[in-house]
Amino acid sequence: MVFFTCNACGESVKKIQVEKHVSNCRNCECLSCIDCGKDFWGDDYKSHVKCISEGQKYGGKGYEAKTHKGDAKQQAWIQKINELIKKPNVSPKVRELLQQISAFDNVPRKKAKFQNWMKNSLKVHSDSVLEQVWDIFSEASSSEQDQQQPPSHTAKPHAEMPITKVPSAKTNGTTEEQTEAKKNKRERKEERQKNRKKEKKELKLENHQENLRGQKPKKRKKNQEAGHEAAGEEAAEASGPPEKKKAQGGQASEEGADRNGGPGEDAAEGQTKTAAGKRKRPKHSGAESGYKKKKMKLPEQPEEGEAKDHEAPSKGKFNWKGTIKAVLKQAPDNEISVKKLKKKVIAQYHAVMNDHHTSEEELLAIFNRKISRNPTFKVLKDRVKLLK
């Protein structure tokens, strides 16, 4: 769209609105284009259909404007309109309309859009006139197509002979480059995403294989350790039974000697003595082990004076009174803070009972009840004292 400025009043006007502005502004004799700055006197502005773009205006000396396909088609369409104006068989009313149409640079090339544009821009609402104008355009376009078709028919026989050419490496390279250039941004993005997914899968497989390799030696080590332990147990079992076997062998030899009788009786008696000695040894070792067990149990037993305080807890019960007394006796002056006493008693409870069902709130309630209701314990503010 071309814009002009009035040299008389300085108002900017579209090309379509120039005639209206001239009727309002009496001193308007010259119009200048906003983009290129050229001056147009009288009706010369009508020839100024298209002006330079902003890129051409501000691009500099080395700027080369890109040719758009739509512009080329529009110029061909306007050229066709100018040719139709010169034809003699066109009615004067239609010729005037064609002259008005040629002044525009945005003429549609399809029937429905063209007729709608005529109604809005040129204010032509009669359907008969619109049909006449479009019929002239359609006849001109069909005649051009008929003129262009014969050369294509003549060129067909030559095209029927197929020429087989061996594609060279250069042509293959150029075709590949062209196909890559033709790819859209979306296709390139999809290819990148696919490549990333493949790389991630490969990395996962490699990590999985490395983990499997690392796990196999660990399993072997575990199996070896288990084998060593089993071998040690078998060796320990094998070292124990030979005494029994020897004893059984001694008994068998005695029975054989009794059956056979004769000079082997002295030897049999000696064997029985050795077997008896070997039988007595395990008993001695058992007695020693029992003695050691008693020694281990002795430190845990309470003294006679403390026997009443530390009552042996029955199965499934915890001796709250005894543990509280024991903790208070260990404290200086048989006095300790409630917080420390609670911490020690509950820790002892968990160590003895291994009970995970009762909550901490229930344990605290039991602890507070035992302290407050027992007359042997005296609670003063935050401290507990054992009364003698």
Curated annotation (Swiss-Prot):
The keyword Cytoplasm belongs to this UniProt entry's keyword annotation: yes
UniProt cross-link Glycyl lysine isopeptide (Lys-Gly) (interchain with G-Cter in SUMO2), position: 14, 204
Region (Disordered): 140-318
Any one Gene Ontology BP term: positive regulation of phagocytosis
SUPFAM superfamilies for the chain: beta-beta-alpha zinc fingers
GO cellular component labels: cytoplasm; nucleolus; nucleoplasm; nucleus; photoreceptor outer segment
Top-rank lineage group of the source organism: Eukaryota
Primary localization class, coarse: nucleus
InterPro entries in UniProt: LYAR (IPR039999), Znf_C2H2_LYAR (IPR014898), Znf_C2H2_sf (IPR036236)
Primary role: Plays a role in the maintenance of the appropriate processing of 47S/45S pre-rRNA to 32S/30S pre-rRNAs and their subsequent processing to produce 18S and 28S rRNAs. Also acts at the level of transcription regulation. Along with PRMT5, binds embryonic globin promoter. Represses the expression of embryonic globin Hbb-y gene. In neuroblastoma cells, may also repress the expression of oxidative stress genes, including CHAC1, HMOX1, SLC7A11, ULBP1 and that encoding the small nucleolar RNA SNORD41. Preferentially binds to a DNA motif containing 5'-GGTTAT-3'.
Quaternary structure annotation from Swiss-Prot or TrEMBL: Interacts with PRMT5; this interaction is direct. Interacts with GNL2 and RPL23A. Interacts with nucleolin/NCL; this interaction is direct. Interacts with phosphorylated IRF3; this interaction impairs IRF3 DNA-binding activity.
Protein name, per record: Cell growth-regulating nucleolar protein
